[in-house]
Amino acid sequence: MGLHQRYATILGNKTLTLAAPIKDELREELRKKFAKMMSALFKQKGANFDINIIASDEAQDFINTHTSVLDSSFQKVEMSDLMRQRLTRSNYIFSGMKTFHELNEAFPSLLDENGNKKTFERFLNDVRKIDETYNSNYLRAEYNFVQASAEMAAKWEKFMEDGDHYYLQYRTQHDDKVRPEHASLDRVTLPPSDSFWESYYPPNGWNCRCTVVQVLKRKYEPTPHDEAMSLGEEALQTDKKGIFRFNSGKEQKTVPDYNPYTIKRCRDCDIAKGKLNLEKAPVADNQLCEACKLVHKCANAHTYSGKTKLTFEDRDAILAKPLNKQYFTKYTGIKGKVLQHE
């Protein structure tokens, strides 16, 4: 099943109409960066798509802008600096993989029906529909999902401060918009340590509005584990690929490793799990896996403070290091030829 078919299956037009619009200025900025990225793609030579364009300044500028759009969805949500940094990293990787698909889909449009290279104006006009599909239609739903994931990740962080002192209870919004399959999970009550929350912690789908609250143990009886798992399985029966079965707070990610822009085995891949000694680990011989590896390498050179921008020399110095030494929590500067880390 292709990417757009997967999206049609898990998204649907009804969901798109529920998604909140992206601010016009953000959408316009993304549109400009898309055009610049297409200009870089237009200059590529050769008959085959070169994934290294992902690391180009134009593509990185687009990825960073797309990441910023997603980050803006939880700008006012209270959470630790570490959680925010890791959610931003998740947004960057998600944006990078999405960008790979946009570039890969745009590449064949470089040639006309006779096999001749188009003018840039015609090429850009032809790929505008790709921009509209990915960065308007899909982005609206992705923005909402990231916002919900971040809010629930922040909640999970607070839940963990209390450990199993309280039970956690699944709650719906109790209105006519609640999906019947989610309604069955309402009032499921379990300790935070129960594995139920690893698979059925909200959001459990695009535009899912479900939440989880802490409740006193003396007031509620816990739901039997097997019963809760059965209800969860029934609630997500339409999610046959298991795309939404993750805990954003526990994994510290806004989007699961397996999403519309990746493949099923990404859930168990060392790259996706952040095991960064990748030079010793084999990578599947396909463009998606190679793109994922490159996106993670770029993410390791990506700064999260929003205040420091790496020079080209700084970035190259980081990327020249072994992969297991590239990742750092905060870039603080360079003294001589030594990278300074916190």
Per-range role (PLM):
Residues D112, F120-F123, R128-D164:
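Internal glycine-rich, Lys/Arg-flanked active-site/core loops of soluble domains
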Residues M1-D131, L216-E342:
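N-terminal leader/targeting and assembly helices and adjacent pre-domain segments
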Residues T67-V69, R128-T133, Y166-D176:
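A broad, low-specificity signal for short, low-complexity segments enriched in glycine/proline
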Residues V146-R218:
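Conserved short secondary-structure elements within globular domains
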